[in-house]
């Protein structure tokens, strides 16, 4: 199991989460998010993997943020194509692709990303991007047949 805490911005929170033993820490680079990180915090975790969360961002901007923040993985919440994911992965970044799930048929959208991404994140379907804090019916995942 991997424990990831997302939406980190404040140095004291970053230190506390790192000391609590989180494996991964997420930084949101989506300007419409209340937890958007507009600049590099005074402190970045040294013991947690740093994850950059992006929505419909250009590969160029993703790579700039990856370098600035020393990201290990990128988490993609938008309409990123398998080809964009493949090219980003080729740079050495781990790629996490997010899929919104409301019903079993939503799992099919992951198929063309199989073998391209390192991880899939299945999230509750909602009107916006990112987590809603609400669980979906996890029994739906029993129908998932992918390997990622």
Locations of the language-model features?
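Conserved N-terminal beta1-alpha1 strand-loop-helix module at the mouth
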Residues: 1-148
């Amino acid at each position: 199991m991997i424990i990831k805490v997302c939406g980190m911005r404040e140095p004291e929170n970053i230190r506390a989460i790192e000391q609590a033993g989180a494996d991964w820490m997420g930084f949101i680079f989506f300007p419409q998010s209340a937890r958007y990180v507009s600049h590099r915090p005074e402190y970045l975790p040294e013991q947690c993997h740093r994850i950059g969360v992006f929505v419909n961002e250009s590969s160029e901007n993703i790579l700039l943020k990856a370098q600035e923040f020393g990201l290990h993985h990128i988490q993609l919440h938008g309409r990123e194509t398998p080809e964009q994911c493949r090219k980003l992965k080729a740079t050495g970044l781990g790629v996490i692709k997010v899929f919104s799930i409301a019903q079993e048929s939503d799992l099919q959208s992951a198929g063309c990303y199989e073998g391209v991404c390192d991880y899939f994140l299945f999230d509750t379907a909602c009107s916006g991007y990112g987590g809603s804090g609400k669980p979906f019916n996890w029994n739906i995942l029993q129908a998932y047949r992918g390997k990622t």
